[in-house]
Amino acid sequence: MKKFRQIDEGLTWVLEAKSVDDQVGRLKDWASSTQCLVPVVRIGVGAEKVDFGIPEGMPATVKIKEDIPEGMGNTTINLEWRRISGFINPDAPIHNISQARRESVWVQILEGLHHAEAKVLTAVKDGKLLDIYPKLEKMLPTLGITEYNKPKAKRKPKAKKEK
Protein backbone atom coordinates (compact mmCIF):
# COMPACT_ATOMS: atom_id res chain seq x y z
CA MET A 1 0.00 0.00 0.00
CA LYS A 2 1.45 3.34 -1.08
CA LYS A 3 1.12 6.42 1.12
CA PHE A 4 1.36 10.01 0.01
CA ARG A 5 1.72 13.21 1.96
CA GLN A 6 -0.12 15.25 -0.67
CA ILE A 7 -3.25 14.49 -2.70
CA ASP A 8 -1.71 15.80 -5.94
CA GLU A 9 1.22 13.35 -5.62
CA GLY A 10 -1.18 10.46 -5.11
CA LEU A 11 -3.42 11.39 -8.04
CA THR A 12 -0.36 11.66 -10.29
CA TRP A 13 0.75 8.18 -9.16
CA VAL A 14 -2.74 6.75 -9.79
CA LEU A 15 -2.89 8.19 -13.30
CA GLU A 16 0.60 6.89 -14.22
CA ALA A 17 -0.82 3.35 -14.44
CA LYS A 18 -1.24 2.13 -18.02
CA SER A 19 -4.78 0.71 -17.96
CA VAL A 20 -7.99 2.00 -16.41
CA ASP A 21 -8.24 -1.16 -14.29
CA ASP A 22 -4.75 -0.56 -12.89
CA GLN A 23 -5.65 3.07 -12.18
CA VAL A 24 -8.83 2.03 -10.36
CA GLY A 25 -6.85 -0.57 -8.40
CA ARG A 26 -4.30 2.03 -7.36
CA LEU A 27 -7.04 4.49 -6.40
CA LYS A 28 -8.86 1.90 -4.27
CA ASP A 29 -5.62 0.78 -2.65
CA TRP A 30 -4.75 4.37 -1.76
CA ALA A 31 -8.33 5.17 -0.63
CA SER A 32 -8.16 2.36 1.92
CA SER A 33 -5.56 4.35 3.86
CA THR A 34 -6.97 7.89 3.66
CA GLN A 35 -10.41 9.10 4.68
CA CYS A 36 -10.56 12.18 2.49
CA LEU A 37 -9.79 10.71 -0.94
CA VAL A 38 -13.28 9.44 -1.84
CA PRO A 39 -15.06 12.72 -0.95
CA VAL A 40 -12.33 14.75 -2.70
CA VAL A 41 -12.78 12.80 -5.93
CA ARG A 42 -16.60 12.68 -5.77
CA ILE A 43 -16.97 16.39 -4.99
CA GLY A 44 -14.12 17.35 -7.32
CA VAL A 45 -15.70 15.74 -10.38
CA GLY A 46 -19.16 17.02 -9.48
CA ALA A 47 -20.74 13.67 -8.59
CA GLU A 48 -21.79 15.27 -5.30
CA LYS A 49 -22.95 18.88 -5.43
CA VAL A 50 -21.69 20.79 -2.40
CA ASP A 51 -22.03 24.48 -1.66
CA PHE A 52 -18.87 25.51 0.15
CA GLY A 53 -20.21 29.03 0.65
CA ILE A 54 -17.04 30.40 -0.95
CA PRO A 55 -16.81 32.27 -4.28
CA GLU A 56 -15.51 30.30 -7.26
CA GLY A 57 -11.80 30.27 -8.03
CA MET A 58 -8.73 31.03 -5.97
CA PRO A 59 -9.39 33.89 -3.52
CA ALA A 60 -7.69 37.14 -4.52
CA THR A 61 -6.30 37.63 -1.01
CA VAL A 62 -4.52 34.27 -0.79
CA LYS A 63 -0.71 34.39 -0.69
CA ILE A 64 0.59 31.03 -1.86
CA LYS A 65 4.35 30.45 -2.01
CA GLU A 66 5.12 28.84 -5.38
CA ASP A 67 8.79 28.11 -4.58
CA ILE A 68 8.20 25.44 -1.92
CA PRO A 69 9.49 21.96 -2.92
CA GLU A 70 7.12 18.97 -3.17
CA GLY A 71 6.04 17.58 0.18
CA MET A 72 7.18 20.64 2.12
CA GLY A 73 3.88 22.46 2.74
CA ASN A 74 3.01 23.33 6.33
CA THR A 75 0.01 21.03 6.23
CA THR A 76 -1.92 18.80 3.80
CA ILE A 77 -5.50 18.21 2.73
CA ASN A 78 -5.39 15.01 4.82
CA LEU A 79 -4.39 16.90 7.95
CA GLU A 80 -6.84 19.74 7.30
CA TRP A 81 -9.73 17.43 6.40
CA ARG A 82 -11.63 18.11 9.63
CA ARG A 83 -11.67 21.86 8.87
CA ILE A 84 -12.42 21.32 5.16
CA SER A 85 -15.30 18.95 5.93
CA GLY A 86 -16.92 21.77 7.89
CA PHE A 87 -17.42 23.59 4.59
CA ILE A 88 -18.98 20.45 3.08
CA ASN A 89 -21.46 19.73 5.89
CA PRO A 90 -24.35 22.25 5.65
CA ASP A 91 -25.07 21.91 9.41
CA ALA A 92 -21.49 22.70 10.46
CA PRO A 93 -20.85 25.77 12.62
CA ILE A 94 -18.69 27.35 9.88
CA HIS A 95 -21.92 28.24 8.05
CA ASN A 96 -23.11 30.30 11.04
CA ILE A 97 -20.28 32.83 10.83
CA SER A 98 -20.06 35.80 8.48
CA GLN A 99 -19.08 35.34 4.84
CA ALA A 100 -15.88 37.36 5.37
CA ARG A 101 -14.80 35.18 8.30
CA ARG A 102 -15.65 31.99 6.39
CA GLU A 103 -13.52 33.17 3.45
CA SER A 104 -10.73 34.05 5.88
CA VAL A 105 -10.74 30.50 7.27
CA TRP A 106 -10.64 29.13 3.71
CA VAL A 107 -7.65 31.36 2.87
CA GLN A 108 -5.85 30.14 6.01
CA ILE A 109 -6.34 26.54 4.88
CA LEU A 110 -5.07 27.28 1.36
CA GLU A 111 -2.03 29.22 2.60
CA GLY A 112 -0.95 26.29 4.77
CA LEU A 113 -1.05 23.85 1.86
CA HIS A 114 1.61 23.27 -0.79
CA HIS A 115 0.76 25.33 -3.88
CA ALA A 116 -0.08 22.21 -5.93
CA GLU A 117 -2.48 20.97 -3.26
CA ALA A 118 -4.05 24.42 -2.93
CA LYS A 119 -4.84 24.33 -6.66
CA VAL A 120 -6.32 20.83 -6.31
CA LEU A 121 -8.47 21.90 -3.34
CA THR A 122 -9.70 24.96 -5.24
CA ALA A 123 -10.59 22.74 -8.21
CA VAL A 124 -12.42 20.35 -5.86
CA LYS A 125 -14.40 23.23 -4.34
CA ASP A 126 -15.40 24.41 -7.82
CA GLY A 127 -16.13 20.86 -9.09
CA LYS A 128 -13.39 21.19 -11.73
CA LEU A 129 -10.97 18.43 -10.76
CA LEU A 130 -11.22 17.01 -14.29
CA ASP A 131 -9.70 20.24 -15.64
CA ILE A 132 -6.49 19.44 -13.74
CA TYR A 133 -6.64 15.64 -14.12
CA PRO A 134 -8.51 14.89 -17.39
CA LYS A 135 -7.37 11.22 -17.37
CA LEU A 136 -9.53 10.75 -14.28
CA GLU A 137 -12.65 10.87 -16.48
CA LYS A 138 -11.94 7.42 -18.00
CA MET A 139 -12.03 5.87 -14.51
CA LEU A 140 -15.37 7.33 -13.40
CA PRO A 141 -17.72 4.73 -15.00
CA THR A 142 -15.68 1.92 -13.43
CA LEU A 143 -16.03 3.67 -10.06
CA GLY A 144 -19.80 3.89 -10.54
CA ILE A 145 -19.83 7.64 -11.14
CA THR A 146 -22.08 8.35 -14.12
CA GLU A 147 -23.13 11.94 -13.52
CA TYR A 148 -20.34 14.44 -13.20
CA ASN A 149 -19.16 17.82 -14.48
CA LYS A 150 -17.90 17.05 -17.95
CA PRO A 151 -14.95 19.28 -18.86
CA LYS A 152 -15.49 21.67 -21.73
CA ALA A 153 -13.87 20.47 -24.93
CA LYS A 154 -11.06 22.68 -26.07
CA ARG A 155 -11.63 23.73 -29.63
CA LYS A 156 -9.00 24.61 -32.13
CA PRO A 157 -9.62 27.91 -33.86
CA LYS A 158 -10.89 27.56 -37.39
CA ALA A 159 -8.41 28.25 -40.12
CA LYS A 160 -9.25 31.35 -42.07
CA LYS A 161 -10.26 30.78 -45.65
CA GLU A 162 -8.08 32.46 -48.19
CA LYS A 163 -9.76 34.24 -51.06
Where are the model-predicted features located?
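N-terminal nucleic-acid-engaging modules of covalent nucleotidyltransferase systems
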Residues: 1-163
